[in-house]
Amino acid sequence: NNKKFKIWIQIAAFSNIKSAKILQDKFKEIQNINVHKVFLKGRNIYRVRVGPFLSIDKADSVYNFLIAKGMQGTKFIVE
């Protein structure tokens, strides 16, 4: 299998775009922070994610920064 995986950090997910954009703006100093819209269980979900990262070291650094800022729900996503 030659599939390349991408590493993302998901900070949070919201049912409304406004909340997602507020969080995105709060952490605008982080490069590559975006809101990703997905349709799940009959509704739109807005995921605030950072990435993709080229290295696990960089992802770890951003993850630790977010945890230190109180974002305890932050998690790694590998796709």
Please provide the spans of the model-predicted regions.
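Conserved beta3-strand ATP-binding lysine motif
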Residues: 12
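Extracytoplasmic
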Residues: 2-5, 15-79
